[in-house]
């Protein structure tokens, strides 16, 4: 057998040409310090802010500090088994969460992983948790109402789709109750609701989930949970993850309602992380950029322009105050970022006025332009009349004799306060709210005892529903109170009052 040297060389050449060697370069570093959920890594020269790092034992970390010779990062899992000297790899990716229709009805953690025991979430799409907010050109003004189903709010502090309205008050004043009622009221209104629990007890989150399930609200809701037992980095990430999940739906042209419960605990988690990363503390030991963590989150709530599909995110952040002090650092920060606040007072709550909304210092800066005309017509004088009532009430406690006009205002105020009371988990449709508020504002309840107002409201709305259904229909379709609707409504009130007073 003759083997020609040329043939051998050509075969070798072909083999060499075919050979491809993939060189994989990995940016890696060494742990020089670890503890308290925080690590310092040396040698990651090409690292970026917010990058995911891969630690041993399949644990990930997020870069927050870029320093001259090392990077500071927070761990997103257990630090058990990880020690100084271990190798850490850079991934070149930032933190992302899964998004999509499959998220609806699920309970997920801050990383978007399911924690409700219903199996994996079937979605392949992911989005980064930190995305710049929509620009001025991409937005349109707030012009559609988002009904909460709560009379005191929809009448005096209206909320529009795309607005950011702060709910602020001491602990145990009904802040979460308002948020949950608002979610329940979105049933059948094509609004996706996201409830973000930050630093709450696990039992509280379980109770909220059970309530939403029983009321059929989980069909259009998502719960993002980072409870008190989870690490500070996960509590810090939760609202951004919730917002990213909501932005997916907003860009589909849908309306989203997102509740952050609460941002006080979010700031506390960020403070803990910052102090462990040895960032210089400022006022109340918060780091200097604590304003920015909330502003960049809440600026992502928007009403998009028609060209971008006209979707919206309405944000209801919650802040817990200490003894009604709204001048503390975090409350003043969030008040200045949002488009208004609903202020809840423990004194009103303890006096039996629930929801305990203080109409005097609560305000909605943009919601008025989204309120329907019929509601504007009935609630125009409501805030003023309540303010006058509060003043007269304080004055009348001294026992001095009041003139007839003051007595009339005092009696009317008592009835208005009674009408604005509402049970939890019983949101009212806007048409029904307008009907009962019209009766209260226009002095039709002056001959009804204050103790009977609640029963009168319930029975009157049932009466209108069975005998005069066209009134509510006309209000909802026309969105304004014409003279014709007013006369129909007044007739119905007079008719029912005769029946009610005879029974009484």
Curated annotation (Swiss-Prot):
Pfam families: ATP-synt_ab (PF00006), ATP-synt_ab_C (PF00306), ATP-synt_ab_N (PF02874). It is an enzyme of class 7 (translocase). Gene3D superfamilies: 2.40.30.20, ATP synthase alpha/beta chain, C-terminal domain (1.20.150.20), P-loop containing nucleotide triphosphate hydrolases (3.40.50.300). GO terms for cellular component: plasma membrane; proton-transporting ATP synthase complex. It catalyses: ATP + H2O + 4 H(+)(in) = ADP + phosphate + 5 H(+)(out). The record marks 362 as: Required for activity. F-type ATPases have 2 components, CF(1) - the catalytic core - and CF(0) - the membrane proton channel. CF(1) has five subunits: alpha(3), beta(3), gamma(1), delta(1), epsilon(1). CF(0) has three main subunits: a(1), b(2) and c(9-12). The alpha and beta chains form an alternating ring which encloses part of the gamma chain. CF(1) is attached to CF(0) by a central stalk formed by the gamma and epsilon chains, while a peripheral stalk is formed by the delta and b chains. Belongs to the ATPase alpha/beta chains family. This is ATP synthase subunit alpha. It comes from Clostridium beijerinckii (strain ATCC 51743 / NCIMB 8052).
């Amino acid at each position: 057998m003759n083997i020609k040297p040329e043939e051998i060389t050509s075969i070798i050449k072909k083999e060499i040409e075919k050979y491809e060697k993939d060189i994989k370069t990995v940016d890696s570093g060494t742990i020089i310090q670890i503890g308290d959920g925080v690590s310092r890594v040396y040698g990651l020269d090409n690292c970026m802010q917010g990058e995911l790092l891969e630690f041993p034992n399949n644990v990930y970390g997020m870069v927050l500090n870029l320093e001259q010779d090392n990077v500071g990062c927070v761990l997103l899992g257990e630090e058990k088994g990880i020690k100084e000297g271990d190798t850490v790899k850079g991934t070149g990716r930032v933190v992302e969460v899964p998004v999509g229709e499959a998220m609806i009805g699920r309970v997920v953690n801050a990383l978007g992983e399911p924690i409700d025991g219903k199996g994996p979430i079937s979605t392949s799409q992911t989005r980064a948790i930190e995305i710049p907010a929509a620009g001025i050109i991409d937005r349109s003004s707030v012009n559609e109402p988002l009904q909460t189903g709560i009379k005191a709010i929809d009448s005096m502090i209206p909320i529009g789709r795309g607005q950011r309205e702060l709910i602020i008050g001491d602990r145990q004043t009904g802040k979460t109750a308002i948020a949950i009622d608002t979610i329940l009221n979105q049933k059948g209104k094509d609004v996706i609701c996201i409830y973000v629990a930050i630093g709450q007890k696990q039992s509280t989150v379980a109770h909220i989930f059970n309530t939403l399930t029983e009321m059929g609200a989980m069909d259009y809701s998502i719960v993002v949970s980072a409870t008190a037992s989870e690490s500070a980095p996960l509590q810090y990430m939760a609202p951004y993850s919730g917002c990213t999940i909501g932005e997916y739906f907003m860009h589909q042209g849908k309306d989203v309602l997102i509740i952050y419960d609460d941002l006080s605990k979010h700031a506390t988690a960020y403070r803990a992380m910052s102090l462990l990363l040895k960032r210089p503390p400022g006022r109340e030991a918060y780091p200097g950029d604590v304003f920015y963590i909330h502003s960049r989150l809440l600026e992502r709530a928007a009403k998009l322009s028609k060209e971008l599909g006209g979707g919206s995110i309405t944000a209801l952040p919650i802040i817990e105050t200490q003894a009604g002090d709204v001048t503390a650092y975090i409350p003043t920060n969030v008040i200045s970022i949002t488009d208004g606040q609903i202020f809840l007072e423990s004194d009103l709550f303890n006096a039996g006025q629930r929801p305990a909304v203080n109409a005097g210092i609560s305000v909605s800066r943009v919601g008025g332009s989204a309120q329907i005309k019929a509601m504007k017509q009935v609630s125009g004088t409501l805030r003023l009349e309540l303010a006058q009532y509060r003043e007269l009430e304080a004055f009348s406690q001294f026992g001095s004799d009041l003139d007839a006009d003051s007595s009339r205002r005092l009696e009317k105020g008592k009835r208005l306060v009674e009408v604005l009371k509402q049970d939890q988990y019983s949101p009212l449709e806007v048409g029904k709210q307008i009907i009962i508020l019209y009766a209260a504002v226009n002095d039709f309840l002056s001959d009804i005892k204050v103790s009977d107002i609640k029963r009168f409201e319930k029975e009157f709305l049932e009466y209108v529903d069975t005998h005069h259904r066209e009134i509510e229909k006309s209000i909802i379709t026309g969105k304004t109170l014409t003279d014709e609707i007013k006369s129909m409504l007044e007739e119905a009130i007079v008719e029912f009052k005769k029946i009610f007073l005879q029974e009484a």
